[in-house]
Regions:
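Generic structural motif
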Residues: 12, 39, 90-94, 133-137
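Generic detector of low-complexity/intrinsically disordered segments
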Residues: 9, 16-17, 89, 103, ...
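Amphipathic protein-protein interaction modules
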Residues: 62-124
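Long, hydrophobic N-terminal alpha-helical segment
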Residues: 2-45
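Residues in well-ordered beta-strands of folded domains
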Residues: 35, 88, 129-131
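Short, well-structured hydrophobic secondary-structure segments
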Residues: 30-80
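Glycine-rich, aromatic-bearing surface loops/beta-hairpins
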Residues: 111-145
Length: 145
């Protein structure tokens, strides 16, 4: 299996098809112009190097979450972002329900919901859900929910 690599993430071993995952993310062309999404994209350009390396090691484009929700906090100066990304992979060792990982304030979990899987993705698919509180960087005010 060319391009498939074993990756150790704490006590879990994942078998990831990096080229296939990257190819799927390259094909995703959607763009969302809601200001909450635009702020997420802006903040991602200044992400912690550990977070960026985590996504790069999985073959995921951090700017293209499969699903993204957001809630203003701290009087509109911060946003709680939750969502998911998908990758062409499977768990080789470790329990699905025990996979919780915190990297630079980002909480990641493997989930079984498999919501909003990119159409181009097939085969073994893992969903990584996340939650993070990020600053509001745009010069626009946060829309009321």
């Amino acid at each position: 299996m060319v391009g498939v690599k074993k990756l150790q993430v704490e006590e879990w071993t994942l078998l990831i098809d990096i080229p296939k995952t990257k190819d799927v993310y390259e094909k995703i062309k959607y763009r969302n112009d809601m200001v909450e999404w635009l702020n997420y994209m802006e903040v991602c350009s200044f992400q912690d190097p550990q977070v960026l390396a985590f996504f790069e090691n999985l073959g995921i484009d951090i700017l293209k979450p499969s699903q993204l929700s957001y809630y203003p906090v701290e009087e509109g100066t911060m946003m709680i972002y939750t969502g998911s990304y998908h990758l062409c992979a499977e768990i080789v060792e470790g329990q699905m329900d025990g996979w919780d990982l915190v990297i630079a304030g980002h909480c990641f979990s493997l989930t079984q919901e498999h919501n909003a899987i990119p159409q181009e993705m097939s085969g073994n698919i893992l969903e990584i859900s996340f939650e993070v509180v990020l600053p509001w960087l745009l010069d626009l005010s946060i829309p009321a929910k």
